[in-house]
């Protein structure tokens, strides 16, 4: 039995230079694994709560308290448990914390232990992590949703939309999809230079030019797709993360300098669908605007994937309410929003059983940990969002997917355009 023997933790830095938690787990059979916890910039109010130190150190963002929680309380509680009983381990973590949002011990400390236990168990079983979590049929490689132009909370510009992504839906394999996306990324740099725009990078490795509008940004990316030798909507499609929480206040959306209602935002998105090959729109409205979300889904949900991030926060209870209300048709999956691997898998299972698509996602504050790459293949999500093909904390996930594709050999299947059944390349 892979019994947990030791649990350690330390404070490390994430990709934005902020502290985060790294956990190490050793099993009685000598197996060892570590996991690092990501952190978001634009966060939903219903997410699991991170335990931060406050005070002057690291601007209040230190995680010494979270590390102490692992060493003094969480570790001793799981030592002696069977690492390959993930549900039992995670339930012990949830019960130990005793709060609905993991605010006592911290979602960051709890998640670090949960993920490190899973990694150690997979090592003990001598199975790749994607196979350990997903079982013998895990073989679908996801479409990389590459955030090649950053705005919103991920960049210091006037662009309200947070992420402009390219999705290589026409590629024959993941490795080719990665190449296509990288070539579009480099073509975009040339397009921006020619237009006299900045080629500085945002938090997730995408370019962060100060463009005039959403449509101007989409036009630049469309030019880059064509300049790289691909056809927009056939080879490479577009996707957005509006992160509407960031421009919503007092019941109104201040978007591109104009106050708008939820209905007016819906009309705006519908107009984009008629002009650009968009396969996915994430967080188009404020997280608590259930009625607006339901109306938007009814209006355009048959033509585009509508992804719930802040509205669902990878929480099965929030997702179930959204399903009942007819909100969105896809779930964004972020392990640190809910705080354990088991709860993450439960949210994915609920989404799939309810006809919702899933997209596995990184956070803007990332580390070199690659578990989300394995998770995407394990659950067969068909989509992964982990930034631009730049910056090592982003590329690490893509490189892990290359390794998984190679390991699967002829059994590997790339999701491609089948990941977006609502999308029609030429609606006319």
From Swiss-Prot:
Major place of residence: cytoplasm
GO cellular component, one term: cell surface
InterPro entries: Enolase (IPR000941), Enolase-like_C_sf (IPR036849), Enolase-like_N (IPR029017), Enolase_C (IPR020810), Enolase_CS (IPR020809), Enolase_N (IPR020811)
Single GO MF descriptor: phosphopyruvate hydratase activity
Pathway of action: Carbohydrate degradation; glycolysis; pyruvate from D-glyceraldehyde 3-phosphate: step 4/5
PANTHER family referenced in this protein's UniProt entry, alphabetically: ENOLASE (PTHR11902:SF1)
Protein name (database record): Enolase
